[in-house]
């Protein structure tokens, strides 16, 4: 199972609302949180974010990765997005008039713009000749959304950054 979650701030929620997907996410499973305390297990400074400081009822919401993806995919057809799935880009041509893509199933697509949002090892990015620099920061985070409720402090999330290299 995919256990990843996102902590969405108010601006993120506004964007998802404008896209028309927030009501479906909130109705399914979005957990509000009022505080977020981040600490570094290696002894760095703690960070504390509190909704009261910003005059808000909640600081944001915790949303599961799978739920977010499901609701975003479901919203694409209503937004006029044409899906070409499953398919992979095999060739890219670009000039002043736009871009042309050839897919592995033989289809050809033309557009004013192609966005390389196909992952860390983006074929489209590579075909366009866009280089990247990669860095592994050797950091992971652990989020315990229930810790705040157990401690009697209300809805709080407590991410912990383990010591470097773990």
What residues fall within each predicted segment?
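Glycine-rich FAD cofactor-binding loop and adjacent beta-loop-alpha segment at the N-terminus
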Residues: 1-33
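A general structural signal for well-ordered alpha-helical segments in protein cores
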Residues: 9-13, 69, 139, 143
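Pocket-edge structural micro-motifs
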Residues: 10, 40, 51, 146, ...
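Conserved FAD-binding catalytic core of PHBH/FMO-like flavoproteins
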Residues: 16, 117-166
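Residue-level detector of short coil/turn "hinge" positions at structural boundaries
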Residues: 23-24, 83, 132
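Conserved N-terminal helical subregion
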Residues: 29-127, 135-139
């Amino acid at each position: 199972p995919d256990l990843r979650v996102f902590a969405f701030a108010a601006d993120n929620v506004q964007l998802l609302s404008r896209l028309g997907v927030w009501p479906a996410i909130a109705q399914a499973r979005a957990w509000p949180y009022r505080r977020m305390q981040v600490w570094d297990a290696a002894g760095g400074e703690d960070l504390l974010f509190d909704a009261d400081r910003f005059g808000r009822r909640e600081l944001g919401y915790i949303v599961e990765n799978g739920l977010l993806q499901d609701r975003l995919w479901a919203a694409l057809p209503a937004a006029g997005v044409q899906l070409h799935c499953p398919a992979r880009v095999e060739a890219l041509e670009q000039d002043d008039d736009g871009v042309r893509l050839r897919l592995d199933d033989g289809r050809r697509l033309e557009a004013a713009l192609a966005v390389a949002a196909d992952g860390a090892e983006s074929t489209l990015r590579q075909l366009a000749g866009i280089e990247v620099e990669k860095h592994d920061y050797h950091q992971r985070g652990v989020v315990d959304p229930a810790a705040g409720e157990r401690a009697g402090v209300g809805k709080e999330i407590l991410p912990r950054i383990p010591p470097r290299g773990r």
